[in-house]
């Protein structure tokens, strides 16, 4: 920021930091773009359904109506959050199975680009938790589920139900509402994290995985896996545009 202030002072005789910051904000807003929207809008579906078989293909999950609907619900929730920030999506897709099965890798590759994925959200009561959400689309909660208690699960349930964060960045004078553009996935070795009450359970969408039944390991050919998942998103986008899935 110091170099920008010096540049504007030398070249434009602007010396007010407040005016320079306001000008930068205006120019940035006039030239903003959304890289995730751009990628999703560029996808062309080849017409082959993959959502139903996706989790079986990579992780050996059952190829069932339940698994298909849970993954579809997650994908459409993620798409809505990008195109309609703050859209209501209160659930977490939870992949349940042994270590080394590729659960975290699945979420990472599903985010399309690695920088749009994060597994760095460790504490929900951190004042700077918003920094862990900025710029990320799919956020995996693994350690929190692994060390869950009744209290922590209630905190997770409350956290994933929010539609916005309210905070002030270093160059802003007042806090602002930031509508959420991310969704949350979970991974666990067991189902022990699930609350016993039905109200708590409905926030978590568990899918059992059986890696020995998978058709391929997701890292066997990462390029092929990424191409497959792009077509999964393309299929989901076709559903989104059809308006037939609420």
Model-derived regions, located:
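Non-catalytic nucleic-acid substrate-recognition regions in nucleic-acid-modifying enzymes
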Residues: 1-9
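Feature primarily recognizes SF3-like P-loop helicase cores of small DNA viruses
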Residues: 9-34, 88, 115-119, 125-152, ...
């Amino acid at each position: 920021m110091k170099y920008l202030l010096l540049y504007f002072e030398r070249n434009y005789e602007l010396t007010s930091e407040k005016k320079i910051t306001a000008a930068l904000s205006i120019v940035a807003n006039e030239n903003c773009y959304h890289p995730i929207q751009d990628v999703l809008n560029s996808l062309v579906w080849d017409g082959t359904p993959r959502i139903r078989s996706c989790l079986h293909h990579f992780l050996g999950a059952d190829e069932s109506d339940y698994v298909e609907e849970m993954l579809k619900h997650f994908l459409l929730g993620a798409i809505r959050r990008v195109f309609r920030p703050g859209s209501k999506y209160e659930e977490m897709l939870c992949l349940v199975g042994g270590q080394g099965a590729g659960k975290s890798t699945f979420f990472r590759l599903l985010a399309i680009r690695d920088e749009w994925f994060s597994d760095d959200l460790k504490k929900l009561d951190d004042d700077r938790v918003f920094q862990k959400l900025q710029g990320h689309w799919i956020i995996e909660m693994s350690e929190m589920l692994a060390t869950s208690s009744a209290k922590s699960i209630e905190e997770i349930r409350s956290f994933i139900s929010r539609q916005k964060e309210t905070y002030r960045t270093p160059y802003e004078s007042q806090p602002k509402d930031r509508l959420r553009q991310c969704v949350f996935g979970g991974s666990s070795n067991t189902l022990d994290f699930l609350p016993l009450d039905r109200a708590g359970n409905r926030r978590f969408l568990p899918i059992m995985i059986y890696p020995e039944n998978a058709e391929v390991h997701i890292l066997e050919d990462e390029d092929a896996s990424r191409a497959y998942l792009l077509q999964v998103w393309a299929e989901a986008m076709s559903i989104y545009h059809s308006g037939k899935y609420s």
